[in-house]
Amino acid sequence: METWKAVLLLAAGLLCGAWRWRSREKRRYRRSVYRAETGKQYKKVEENRGMDGEYRTSLELEKRIRGRRYFVFNAYIPCRSGGSTETDIVMIHEKGIFVIENKNYCGQVRGRANREYWEHILPGKRRTFYNPIYQNQGHVRHLRRLLGEHGYHLPMVSVIVFNDGVKRLRVKMAGSDAILCRSRRAASKINRRLRRMEQVLDEAEMEEVYGILKAQTRPFWWVRYGQRKRAEKLQKKAGKI
C-alpha cells in the first residue's frame, strides 16, 4: 500500500510539474513578439515544427539583440517572374535588414556554402535538401528589389539558423559572408556583425519599412498555394540527388 501511495504521489508531482511548465511556456508565448505579430495560437505553433522553430529563434533575438528593431514573420516577397518567395523572419534594424532562414531539424547537418545540396543525417537515414544559403540569397535579392522600389537601398545580411535540435552542424562557409549558426548563438553572432555596421535608418524610416513588409504577410490564398507547391517541387528534386 505504501508503495502505491509513493507511486501516486510521484505521478501527481510529475503532472503538476508538467502543468506548471506548460503554463509558464504559454505565458511567455503570450508576451512574445512572435505572437503579437502573427496572432497564432500557442497550440498551433507548438504542433508545427516550422512555426515552433521560428518562434524559438525569435525569442532569442527579441531578448538579446541590441538596438532598435522590428520583426516581420512569413512575408511573401514578390518575384520578378510574377510569383513570390516566403521569408521566415525579417529583422528591420536601425543598421540594416537581417533576412533569417530558420530550419528546425534534428540530428546532423553537413554541407558546403558553395554546394547546391546539403545532407541531413538522422540515425539510419539520410536526405538531401537545397542549400539554405542559396535559398536565402533569393529572398535577399527579391527583398532588395521590393525595398528599392520604395526608395530604400539598405545593407542586408543573410542569416541561416538551425534550431538546437541539430547536434552537429558541419558546414564549410568559405566564400560566403552569410551568418550560419544554431538558434542559441544567433543573437551573439548578429550582435557581432552589428558592431561593424553604421546606423542607416531613423525611427520613422524603420516604421515605413516595417509597413512595407508587414503588408506582404497577408497574401491571397493562391499566393500561399503557389509558394507551397514550389517548395514541394524543390524538395522532391533534392530527394533525387
Listing of model-derived features with the role each one plays in the protein:
Residues 1-85, 96, 125-241:
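Surface-exposed interaction regions that form or flank ligand-binding interfaces
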Residues 86-92:
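Catalytic metal-binding acidic patch
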Residues 92-117:
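Active-site beta-strand-loop-beta-strand hairpin of nuclease catalytic cores
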Residues 36-38, 115-122:
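Short, basic/glycine-rich phosphate-binding loops at helix/coil junctions
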